[in-house]
Structures are given as C-alpha cells and as structure tokens.
Amino acid sequence: MVSLLDFNGNMSQVTGETTLLYKEIARNVEKTKKIKIIDFGIGQPDLPTFKRIRDAAKEALDQGFTFYTSAFGIDELREKIAQYLNTRYGTDVKKEEVIVTPGAKPALFLVFILYINPSDEVILPDPSFYSYAEVVKLLGGKPIYANLKWSREEGFSIDVDDLQSKISKRTKMIVFNNPHNPTGTLFSPNDVKKIVDISRDNKIILLSDEIYDNFVYEGKMRSTLEDSDWRDFLIYVNGFSKTFSMTGWRLGYIVAKREIIQKMGILAANVYTAPTSFVQKAAVKAFDTFDEVNQMVSLFKKRRDVMYDELTKVKGVEVSKPNGAFYMFPNVSKILKTSGFDVKSLAIKLIEEKGVVTIPGEVFPLNIGKEFLRLSFAVNEEVIKEGIQKIREFAEQMMNSR
C-alpha cells in the first residue's frame, strides 16, 4: 500500500523558502497587534516594470502571440541576450549558446538536474542564497560550504585557502554568485579570477549566478564570461527579474556551450515545455530600457547610502557598505551576546516588538550568517529611516537588557 505522503526520500532534507516564514510572522503581528510593518526582507525592486516593457507585452497579447514557443525561447530574444553580453563583457556568445527559462530559479534547477548525481559534492559560499543547497539535496547531492572572509573594513571576500581545502574527488561543481546575495558584495576582479582559475585548473564545473550584475555602485563588475575559454568550464545564469524590475514576469536564461544547451532544451521541453510567449516579446524590448535601469540603480545607491549611514548609528551593530545588489548584511554579534538570543529569535523579536522585518543570516546557510541580519534597501528612503530608527531603539533595549 502506497501513501500519498510517501514522498521522495530526499524531500526530508529540503526546507521551504524560509524568508517567507518571517513575512508570515509579520502578517500575524500586523493583524493581532495592529503594528505598522516595515519590510526589509523583500528581495525585489519596488519600482513597477518599465512602461516600454509593459507596452510590448500588451502588443504581443493583442497580436495573438500566446502560443507555445521553442523550448529554447524565441530566436529574437536569444540573439538579443547574446548581443548584450558580448557588448558588455567583450565575449563571444552565440545565439545557440543561450536558452531562455521561466525565471533564474528554473534555470538553476535545470543546471542541477543535468549534472548532479547522488553523492556528488557541490561547493557553495557560506553564506549563500538558500535555494542552491535545497535543490542539490533534493537530487541526492551534498552541499559543501566554503567560508567567505569578513571584516568591517573590507566586507566579504573569497577565502581561497578554505575553498581549495573543500575540493575532493567527489566535487562536481562550484557555485559562484556575484554580486552576492545575501551580503551585497561585489567581488573584486581578482576574486573572480581566482574562482575561474580554481574551477579550470581542477576541471570542476563553475555555475555562475550573476542575476544582480547591473546593481553595481562602486568598482568593476567582472563577469566569468570574460574568460576566453569560458566554454570549457562555465555555466552562466542570469535573468530579467532584478535588472528590469520584472520579478513576477518569470524570465531567466542560461549560457553555456552549444552541446550543453541542447541537453537543457530536452530537459526544458519535458519540465515546462517553453517560457511564456508574450513575456519573451516584452523581454526583447527590455534591452531598450537601460536609461530606466540606470536611473533605478542611481536611486538604489542613494538608498544604500542612507541605510548604511543610519545603521552605523545603531548600538551593537557593525556594518560594511556593500558595492552591489540591494542588501545590507550587518553583524549583530554584540547584540546576540548581550541579549542571549540567537539570530533567528532576534529577528522574530524585532518583528513582534517593532514591526520590522529582517532576514536572519542563518537562513543563508551554513555558519557565517549566524551573526548577521539581511536587510534589503529596495524601499524608499523615508521607510529606511523609520525602520532603522526602530532597529536602533530595539538594539538599545537589547544591549541594556542584562
């Protein structure tokens, strides 16, 4: 007899999207305590999708572009993606080396399905975006964590010695994310070169997630695609959600050599058939909206500066100014030590008492995040100031509690 609850055995290791847990707590607090909620947990731009993109989607719908496309995506969009990457990074991507997916998460899922066998090891940064590890575990693989180094002065950087020490005969893949979620780090060109060299020299697949590549405030964004022999080791993932404020539209893409993309197409056809047709047409137009993108990034830089300045005034908090993405990752170890809370309990207490949503760093496994909170500055400046003032009051209360 088979039960409907007789799930794949690997599901026992997989957790839900745990950032949503804190949003649910906030909803309950708002309902029961009538407290105003300030949400620093959100991982998406707060601006509406740019008008020209919306108009292109409407036009595609009006023209009846509502049927299945190729599993690889429409040629017009694949060509646009290749042209954009080649112009920006001086690389040589061909249209046939691009597959369009219904979001960057499905892109990551396709990559992991294609490569990960039971007992394969995948090296992830600690901390890192939680979905990487969950999908690896679902497929029977084993996440192995390589620590990032942190100092208040320098922020986060690659710990090459720790990374190399984690490589074994079972290592199948290294996952790299730049700019980085949850820390907001834009890794230096030298750090990117180190990752590329380690992958190439050890003949390990490099999966590079560069979804935040346009959210750069200082420094140079070096893409892994800039390496001349990228086809020998690289699987590149990106998408439209962050750059063009299209999170709900669900569109991403993978770049890899042609033989790999052909295999991806077989998987895609069996998993979801094809990306949404009219959304692809809208995405073609997205490449004409970089004036709007640049305005958004300038706005986010101002917000970052406001949040950083306000956080430096908070007792018990140490924070580095991030150069990329739209996250701040302050160290709250002094507050934890004084209050006796762990970081998850602290985040919940902050919601319950002040209505401020942050994401505890422990959500971004494994160990480094246990002393950090993630805050998004994808909200307006007044909300940032109000929210950080509440955190300041809360921190003083916690620091004086013992």
Curated annotation (Swiss-Prot):
InterPro entries: Aminotransferase_I/II_large (IPR004839), AspAT/PAT-like (IPR050596), NHTrfase_class1_PyrdxlP-BS (IPR004838), PyrdxlP-dep_Trfase (IPR015424), PyrdxlP-dep_Trfase_major (IPR015421), PyrdxlP-dep_Trfase_small (IPR015422). The modification N6-(pyridoxal phosphate)lysine is found at K242. Pfam families: Aminotran_1_2. Its EC number is 2.6.1.1. Keywords: Aminotransferase, Cytoplasm, Methylation, Pyridoxal phosphate, Transferase. One of its GO terms (cellular component) is cytoplasm. It is found in: Cytoplasm. L-aspartate binds at G43, N181, R374. This is Aspartate aminotransferase. The gene is aspC.
